[in-house]
């Protein structure tokens, strides 16, 4: 990295008057002569106060000019001065040696991140005390004096004291030490010791070991990405260690320094590692990431490196982002962040390409594992004279082939896919430089569009589309897609940026088509039976279903408009274009109906059938819905949701076919019972028959096999123990929840009591599956957010919930007496969800449906059920779901006489009461 010159740093650090502070330290030495401990404490207090003033000034300047790298340089300069002052105080006033011996020499050196000359406000300080020989009493005293001064100031200091010989020995065998010395920067003391270390390091450690170092750093990078999250598009990224973060830039520069022996980042231009545009990108990325990191540290007062939801909005405001129609300020900031992370990935690929170029020359740069194998030859790609195969990677046969025929910008990716070839870094670099050739003419070209559909519908489309996206080709070719590249949705439900989500959905769709995943068995079965002509339809609908995110209007409706404009260009006829548009417009419908409607109510099925209108469209919508839910992130798809979709599909099929179904309800009941009998062999046939009769058909059709078996064991254990109320605890690591299965005598207020008990124990309900047995027992499975790391602690919390439920049911406890006053948790505070209450009688002939949506918070379900009961309504069934920070609960209700709520004035009163309840918990910071 470029270091500040003395002149620049001094100017930047105006307000830190080194000369004055030296005078103050001298005065303290005179005042406290003979009292070393008092003098040390006084110096620490003085320097701490001066540093605090500088940090305040640095933060104010950062908020004004938003130049993160300048802020990091300023803070580093001041820290350098503080270390020099503490060294001066130690050697002039505490351990002064008028005629120092050869052993009384020391160089104080900055290493690691501090050695780069850039420092975030709460960063650690890494120091190396270099001695000529072994440790001496004088050296130990001086080093301790400096360290205690820094520690007393509240700074985090990592340190080592070594001779030059020992430093060289350790650098040879320890890559961490080697990297630290690579970044070493002289601070104060004996310059000759530092120069000796660097000279010997270059000749005795670095020389001839470039391949080893590069391999180690790239392996370290992969391990770091694995720990921080492999995707650079995770929506709560680690600014320092995440993919596309500052550490990746540092790794680039470490490799460049080691291989090319450069000291300053601008030397990368002279060595032709980067061209001018790429170097500017390097500097721009560094400045932006340093701005984010410095603001994170200032905002939290700690070395916080993760851009969590509760910090993203504050950092966006600090950096001056404003909201635009369809996009919040925080979403615009995070889009900039992810675009920067993408640029960092591009720079990494460019450096790797340069290193591979070097490998072809005599100077050894890379290890054999990264170089061309002996005998590797360059040959033409089959069916093309424009591309070559270089070490099993596709490359350009001529540098001007994109200019000669811009269709080659699409053809490159199709040929790589067709021939199972990796991409040569040089080819990707040329693609990035040629993106401007993708114009209206190329977008309308029939051949380029044919090639794109082949890419989309052929093997390994996810990998190829991701390469197209990373190089910018996908966003230029489909401009609507370009608008959602690196777009983050500011919510806790989606795990990835919009473009990454869509590309992952294509990969999931191909998993579904291969049929090798039992978790999506229904979608796999349907994929094999759709009209073959509709295969491209489901692929393009999957790629485009969220393409209109970030617009002011409903993204489903806007996305359908995009499809109607785009699909004819891609070769779809009018009927298929309209089918794609319909799938995009309805892509949320099936999930919503399955998870928040009563699937045992005939009206629900009829309404859904009226939307889909044909079995073929329902098949396609089921496949798209499955891919969409699975693509949201780990743990979002589960057995409950799979079973609900299956139930909705097979309940609707007979309505669409006039009574005919490939699998009718009776057959599905028989199949579900047979599946349970085959899997659960612990009971006799008589016991199984009796148990199966305890559940209504809806239970057997909607509950997945794993939970059916768990419930059977639980009910048997409860009977044997004689307990009227029992709770079984399970842990779902994939979803990050604890499942409470509650068996109790059915009670009109039972759901409210369960919700209140969970709230009183600090448990937040995120999902609920509620059933009643034929003998009047309630069997409710409640998923609560996991609070504790250890299962034992979660188990104790569950026991507390069971105790509260039992005491309330027996009349020994009133819930209001144990309900805490809880605001939204820290994770929810940044979010605002507009309260929404919908009341209608169209989804049921027997009940009125009340759908509420708002910001989730502890105790919300208890508050809602209590409010509904106080409104003189009976809850017939409830469908509880949480999507990140958003709660969406549906209640099927009647009045106390069992009638639906039809009076507009009564509906309005219910709506007002529930909206007020939801609004009382809305928050944002």
UniProtKB/Swiss-Prot annotation:
Region Uridylyl-removing, as annotated, extends over 383-738
Transcription regulation keyword on record: no
Query: How would you summarize its activity regulation?
Result: Uridylyltransferase (UTase) activity is inhibited by glutamine, while glutamine activates uridylyl-removing (UR) activity.
Which prosthetic group or cofactor does it need? Mg(2+)
**Membrane-crossing residues?**
none
Which GO terms fall under biological process for this protein? regulation of nitrogen utilization
Question: GO MF annotations for this entry?
Answer: [protein-PII] uridylyltransferase activity; phosphoric diester hydrolase activity
Q: Which Gene3D superfamilies match?
A: 3.30.70.260, Beta Polymerase, domain 2 (3.30.460.10), cca-adding enzyme, domain 2 (1.10.3090.10)
Q: Which residues form the ACT domain?
A: 739-820, 849-925
Mind listing the UniProt keywords for this protein, alphabetically?
Hydrolase, Magnesium, Multifunctional enzyme, Nucleotidyltransferase, Repeat, Transferase
Q: Name the NCBIfam families on file.
A: PRK05092.1, UTase_glnD
Q: What does this protein do?
A: Modifies, by uridylylation and deuridylylation, the PII regulatory proteins (GlnB and homologs), in response to the nitrogen status of the cell that GlnD senses through the glutamine level. Under low glutamine levels, catalyzes the conversion of the PII proteins and UTP to PII-UMP and PPi, while under higher glutamine levels, GlnD hydrolyzes PII-UMP to PII and UMP (deuridylylation). Thus, controls uridylylation state and activity of the PII proteins, and plays an important role in the regulation of nitrogen assimilation and metabolism.
Q: Which HAMAP family match?
A: PII_uridylyl_transf (MF_00277)
Know anything about its domains from the record? Has four distinct domains: an N-terminal nucleotidyltransferase (NT) domain responsible for UTase activity, a central HD domain that encodes UR activity, and two C-terminal ACT domains that seem to have a role in glutamine sensing.
- Mind telling me what this protein is named? Bifunctional uridylyltransferase/uridylyl-removing enzyme
């Amino acid at each position: 990295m470029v270091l500040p010159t003395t002149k620049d740093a001094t100017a930047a650090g105006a307000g830190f008057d080194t000369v004055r502070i030296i005078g103050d330290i001298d005065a303290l030495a005179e005042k406290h002569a003979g009292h070393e401990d008092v003098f040390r404490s006084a110096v620490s207090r003085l320097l701490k106060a001066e540093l605090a003033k500088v940090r305040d000034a640095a933060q104010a300047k950062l908020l004004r000019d938003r130049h993160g790298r300048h802020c990091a340089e300023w803070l580093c300069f001041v820290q350098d001065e503080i270390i020099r002052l503490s060294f001066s105080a130690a050697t002039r006033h505490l351990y002064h040696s008028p005629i120092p011996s050869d052993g009384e020499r020391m160089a104080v050196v900055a290493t690691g991140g501090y050695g780069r000359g850039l420092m975030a406000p709460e960063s650690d300080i890494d120091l190396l005390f270099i001695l000529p020989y072994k440790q001496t009493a004088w050296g130990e005293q001086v080093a301790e004096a400096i360290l205690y001064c820094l520690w007393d100031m509240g700074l985090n200091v990592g340190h080592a004291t070594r001779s030059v010989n020992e430093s060289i020995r350790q650098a040879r065998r320890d890559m961490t030490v080697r990297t630290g010395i690579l970044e070493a920067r002289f601070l104060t003391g004996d310059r000759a010791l530092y120069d000796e270390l660097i000279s010997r390091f270059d000749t005795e450690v670095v020389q001839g070991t470039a391949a080893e170092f590069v391999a180690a750093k790239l392996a370290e990078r992969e391990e770091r990405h694995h720990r921080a999250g492999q995707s650079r598009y995770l929506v709560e990224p680690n600014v320092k260690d995440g993919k596309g973060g500052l550490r990746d830039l540092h790794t680039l520069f470490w490799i460049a320094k080691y291989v090319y022996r450069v000291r300053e980042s601008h030397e990368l231009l002279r060595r032709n590692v980067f061209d001018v545009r790429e170097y500017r990108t390097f500097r721009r990325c560094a400045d932006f990431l340093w701005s984010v990191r410095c603001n994170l540290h200032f905002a939290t007062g700690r070395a916080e490196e993760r851009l969590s939801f509760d910090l993203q909005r504050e950092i966006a405001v600090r950096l001056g982002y404003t909201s635009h129609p369809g996009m919040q300020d925080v979403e615009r900031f995070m889009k900039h962040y992810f675009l920067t992370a993408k640029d960092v990935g591009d720079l990494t690929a460019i450096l790797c390409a340069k290193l591979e170029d070097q490998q072809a020359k005599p100077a050894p740069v890379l290890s054999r594992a990264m170089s061309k194998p002996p005998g590797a030859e360059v040959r033409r790609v089959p069916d093309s004279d424009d591309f070559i195969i270089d070490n099993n990677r596709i490359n350009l046969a001529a540098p001007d082939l994109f200019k000669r025929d811009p269709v080659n910008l699409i053809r490159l990716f199709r040929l790589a896919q067709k021939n199972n070839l990796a991409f040569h870094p040089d080819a990707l670099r040329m693609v990035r430089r040629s993106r401007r050739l993708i114009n209206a003419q190329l977008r309308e070209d029939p051949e380029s569009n044919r090639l794109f559909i082949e890419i989309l519908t052929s093997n390994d489309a996810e990998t190829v589309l991701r390469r197209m996206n990373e190089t910018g080709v996908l966003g230029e070719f489909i401009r609507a897609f370009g608008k959602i590249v690196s777009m983050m949705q500011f919510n806790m439900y989606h795990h990835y940026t919009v473009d990454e989500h869509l590309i992952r959905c294509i990969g999931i769709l191909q998993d579904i088509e291969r049929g090798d995943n039992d978790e999506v068995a229904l979608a796999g079965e349907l994929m094999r039976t759709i009209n073959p002509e509709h295969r491209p339809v489901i692929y393009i609908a999957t790629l485009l279903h969220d393409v209109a995110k970030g617009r002011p209007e409903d993204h489903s409706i806007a996305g359908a408009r995009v499809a109607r404009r785009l699909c004819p260009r891609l070769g779809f006829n009018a009927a298929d274009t309209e089918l794609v548009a319909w799938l995009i417009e309805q892509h949320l419908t099936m999930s919503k109906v399955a998870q928040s409607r009563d699937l045992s109510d005939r009206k629900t099925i009829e309404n859904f059938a009226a939307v889909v209108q044909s079995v073929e469209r329902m098949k396609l919508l089921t496949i798209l819905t499955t891919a969409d839910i699975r693509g949201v992130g780990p743990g979002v798809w589960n057995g409950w949701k799979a079973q609900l979709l299956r139930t909705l599909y097979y309940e609707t099929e007979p309505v669409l076919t006039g009574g005919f179904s490939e699998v009718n309800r009776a057959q599905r009941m028989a199949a579900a019972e047979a599946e349970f009998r085959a899997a659960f062999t612990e009971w006799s046939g008589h016991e199984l028959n009796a148990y199966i009769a305890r559940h209504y058909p809806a239970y057997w059709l909607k509950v997945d096999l794993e939970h059916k078996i768990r419930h059977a064991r639980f009910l048997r254990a409860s009977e044997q123990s004689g307990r009227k109320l029992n709770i079984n605890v399970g842990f779902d690591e994939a979803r990050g929840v604890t499942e409470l299965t509650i068996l109790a005598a059915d009670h009109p207020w039972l759901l409210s009591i369960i919700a209140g008990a969970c709230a009183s124990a600090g448990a937040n309900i995120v999902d609920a599956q509620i059933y009643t047995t034929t003998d009047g027992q309630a069997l409710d499975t409640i998923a609560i957010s996991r609070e504790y790391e250890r299962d034992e602690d979660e188990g104790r919390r569950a026991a507390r919930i069971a105790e509260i439920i039992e005491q309330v049911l027996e009349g020994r406890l009133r819930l209001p007496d144990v309900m805490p006053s809880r605001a939204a948790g820290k994770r929810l505070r940044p979010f605002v969800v507009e309260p929404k209450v919908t009341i209608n009688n169209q989804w049921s002939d027997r009940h009125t449906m009340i759908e509420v949506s708002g910001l989730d918070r502890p105790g919300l379900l208890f508050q809602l059920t209590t409010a509904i009961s106080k409104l003189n309504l009976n809850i017939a069934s409830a469908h509880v779901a949480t999507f990140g920070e958003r709660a969406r609960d549906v209640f099927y209700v009647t009045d106390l006489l069992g009638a639906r709520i039809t009076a507009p004035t009564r509906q309005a009163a219910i709506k007002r009461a529930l909206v007020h309840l939801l609004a009382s918990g809305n928050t944002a910071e």
